[in-house]
Amino acid sequence: MRLARLLRGAALAGPGPGLRAAGFSRSFSSDSGSSPASERGVPGQVDFYARFSPSPLSMKQFLDFGSVNACEKTSFMFLRQELPVRLANIMKEISLLPDNLLRTPSVQLVQSWYIQSLQELLDFKDKSAEDAKAIYDFTDTVIRIRNRHNDVIPTMAQGVIEYKESFGVDPVTSQNVQYFLDRFYMSRISIRMLLNQHSLLFGGKGKGSPSHRKHIGSINPNCNVLEVIKDGYENARRLCDLYYINSPELELEELNAKSPGQPIQVVYVPSHLYHMVFELFKNAMRATMEHHANRGVYPPIQVHVTLGNEDLTVKMSDRGGGVPLRKIDRLFNYMYSTAPRPRVETSRAVPLAGFGYGLPISRLYAQYFQGDLKLYSLEGYGTDAVIYIKALSTDSIERLPVYNKAAWKHYNTNHEADDWCVPSREPKDMTTFRSA
């Protein structure tokens, strides 16, 4: 807790003036006022690196770097600066969480992982890119950090659950936690993307895998969208058959408006797309099976895939009864789930419904490269889930949270009551307003 208190104290001071000026050089030298060496301890290191904005990369940049004479030295020089910046930016926001949430064992564990990873990366800040042993050790460190952060999502989720069960959550805290988790998990996705790219390109393992031979790290330059959708459907179907002894069929159609008659392919991370469609299939299957439980006949899940000049769109339609409009936003709330929460020790088993994180995390995966995920529901009939992905790799640019004055203000501003009238539950008695 001592480190947590120190980091929190530094965060409460707010971001320094002028830290986000346009054209601020990513040069950790005298032009930034101080250097990591002059900062003492973890709080000083976090403060220093949080002064820099993360550098978002486009899918094309990821692709070009990995496919044209991939250079481990170049990756080393970029990551040893960029990873501390991304870690430090989100660590500042962790420190702004409510004290009681910071004290939960799960959040303390997550915080310790981030501190340890930052310190390990900073060991390489003065190493030469010409030092072969330093490059080798750095790749090992990247893989170790990636493995350390494997359970960040369920561990942070458990911390929030512990906090809610012990202290409850008022509307302001709930709003701040929702805001934080969106940014924290988006940061985690981006950090893992960098770690995966380096470890897959230079880690030495998996390079010869036939199924991934044409991949650039975790990116498939010719990702066959229908194949990923079918894979997600089959795996969700196995779970559905296990739970309900039956499952709805899949009706899949594609329309390539850009190149008629050709299969739809896009530069993308297949694991991200798989995560999204797998979660949507689980939700659609569960809703369909439960809504039609007494009928014994289960309508198929329809999926339409279209590729235009700007967007790749995947629309999944079910006849699972839908949800009321007032509940749509709740479906993207991290603490909302219509199914019982699994026990922590079984959270890795990927049940058909669980923490309630499937939809919000899936939306973050879509938004990570400037896409989106939206729900449109017809209560009593069914739901359409629509995934939007950028069709061009040059438009697919990382969406990254940055710790600045706007973010700091969000955590430290009291959110006033809504500025729209709240309707009463009972009709107003207009007789009291009759004129004499």
From Swiss-Prot:
The keyword Phosphoprotein applies. Its EC number is 2.7.11.2. Residues 163-393 form the Histidine kinase domain. Activity is enhanced by binding to the pyruvate dehydrogenase subunit DLAT. Inhibited by AZD7545; this compound interferes with DLAT binding and thereby inhibits kinase activity. Inhibited by dichloroacetate and radicicol. Activated under hypoxic conditions by phosphoglycerate kinase PGK1-mediated phosphorylation at Thr-338. GO terms for biological process: cell population proliferation; glucose metabolic process; hypoxia-inducible factor-1alpha signaling pathway; intrinsic apoptotic signaling pathway in response to oxidative stress; regulation of acetyl-CoA biosynthetic process from pyruvate; regulation of glucose metabolic process. Expressed predominantly in the heart. Detected at lower levels in liver, skeletal muscle and pancreas. The modification Phosphotyrosine is found at residues 136, 243-244. GO terms for cellular component: mitochondrial matrix; mitochondrion; pyruvate dehydrogenase complex. It is found in: Mitochondrion matrix. PROSITE patterns: HIS_KIN. Phosphorylated by constitutively activated ABL1, FGFR1, FLT3 and JAK2 (in vitro), and this may also occur in cancer cells that express constitutively activated ABL1, FGFR1, FLT3 and JAK2. Phosphorylation at Tyr-243 and Tyr-244 strongly increases kinase activity, while phosphorylation at Tyr-136 has a lesser effect. Phosphorylated under hypoxic conditions at Thr-338 by phosphoglycerate kinase PGK1 which has an activating effect. One of its GO terms (molecular function) is pyruvate dehydrogenase (acetyl-transferring) kinase activity. CDD domains: HATPase_PDK-like (cd16929). Its main location: mitochondrion. It is an enzyme of class 2 (transferase). Induction: Up-regulated via the HIF1A signaling pathway in response to hypoxia. The modification N6-succinyllysine is found at residue 405. Homodimer, and heterodimer with PDK2. Interacts with the pyruvate dehydrogenase complex subunit DLAT, and is part of the multimeric pyruvate dehydrogenase complex that contains multiple copies of pyruvate dehydrogenase (E1), dihydrolipoamide acetyltransferase (DLAT, E2) and lipoamide dehydrogenase (DLD, E3). Interacts with phosphoglycerate kinase PGK1; the interaction is direct, occurs under hypoxic conditions and leads to PDK1-mediated inhibition of pyruvate dehydrogenase complex activity. Belongs to the PDK/BCKDK protein kinase family. This is [Pyruvate dehydrogenase (acetyl-transferring)] kinase isozyme 1, mitochondrial. It comes from Homo sapiens (Human).
